[in-house]
Design a protein with these regions (language model features):
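Catalytic machinery of carbohydrate-active enzymes
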Residues: 1-308
Length: 308
């Protein structure tokens, strides 16, 4: 069987779909599973052993408009898929599968263009997003964890950076990651609050604080050039390397964005999600019991997260 997953949303959404990928492979172990997504999302699923191929649809770049749509459609037609699973809730994704003549297409009832689906699944707002995605394949079993798969070279690079700053994972040393950015500015906790957290933590020389994010997030004013135990990873590592970094962390603090979802896929860190407009009730909180969510706007203004 040839299966296609279509999901062209944000990075965090792709991370949350990794349990769905695992479940599809468990259900159809001999199948070939391809994943269609944006180029910016590729690295977070690039080493996933359950995927056969990642197909890129640069809908905001070179594939923008009808010409790009037709280019991707041609690829899908040639693949002759048997089954399409579409977490993305927009008609363009459903149209790609329909026009590619995939005989079995499943997606959510709230999707625009859901009338084109062979099977519509209820999008249950009471559930976590991971569980909603697993509803697409009618899974009701034990929890399937989020997973990304850093390679050996990713760990080597991260270890080299950490050791350069004096972090060796020795007893007493703590690695705390702070992810202050988001692709949506309205989800970001005030940067001065993150600065205050870092200022407090860096006083303990056994605490190593890693500031993470994209190259664009370097503009956020969190610079500590004279503090060796504050390490700025922004723009220096990709998402899979970020996974390798997270696997070593004791604590991850971040906004309602992809870092807290990636962190949920690793056993070691305790995850603190700081939520503003994206409320926990929407189902996008950290998918791990080792977590805490702060989502009261008034609380933001009067408190600093306390980290032991």
């Amino acid at each position: 069987m040839k299966i296609l997953v279509i999901h062209t949303a944000f990075i965090g959404d792709i991370v949350l779909s990794t349990p769905l990928i695992q479940r599809l492979k468990d259900m159809y172990p001999e199948s070939e599973i391809d994943y269609l997504t944006l180029p910016t999302n590729k690295s977070v699923i690039s080493n996933n052993p359950n995927l056969n191929e990642i197909i890129l649809y640069d809908k905001k770049g070179q594939d923008k408009g009808i010409k790009g749509f037709l280019r991707v459609l041609k690829i899908l037609k040639q693949k002759k898929y048997d089954y399409a699973v579409i977490p993305h809730r927009f008609i363009k994704s459903i149209l790609l599968a329909k026009l590619a003549k995939i005989p079995n297409i499943v997606g959510f009832d709230v999707a625009t263009g859901s009338f084109l689906l062979n099977k519509k699944v209820h999008y249950d707002m009471k559930k976590h997003e991971v569980e909603r995605l697993l509803d697409l394949v009618e899974y009701k079993g034990e929890k399937i964890p989020i997973r990304i798969y850093p390679a050996k070279e990713n760990f080597t690079k991260i270890n080299k950076i950490l050791e350069h700053h004096g972090y060796f994972g020795n007893e007493g040393q703590k690695l705390i990651l702070v992810a202050p950015g988001s692709q949506r500015a309205e989800k970001m906790w005030p940067i001065e609050k993150y600065r205050e957290i870092i200022e407090r933590l860096k006083k303990n020389k056994n605490y190593f604080i890693g500031i993470t994010g994209s190259k664009a997030e370097k503009k956020l004013s969190l610079n500590f050039p004279n503090d060796k135990n504050v390490i700025d990873f922004r723009g220096e590592i990709n998402l899979v390397e970020f996974g390798a970094l997270i696997s070593k962390a004791n604590i991850v603090v971040g906004n309602d964005s992809s870092p807290i979802h990636i962190a949920s896929g690793f056993e070691k860190p305790f995850v603190i999600g700081i939520f503003g407009p994206g409320k926990r009730d929407l189902g996008f909180f950290p998918y791990t019991e080792k977590s805490n969510v702060i989502e009261d706007n008034e609380f933001y203004e009067n408190n600093i997260v306390k980290i032991p």
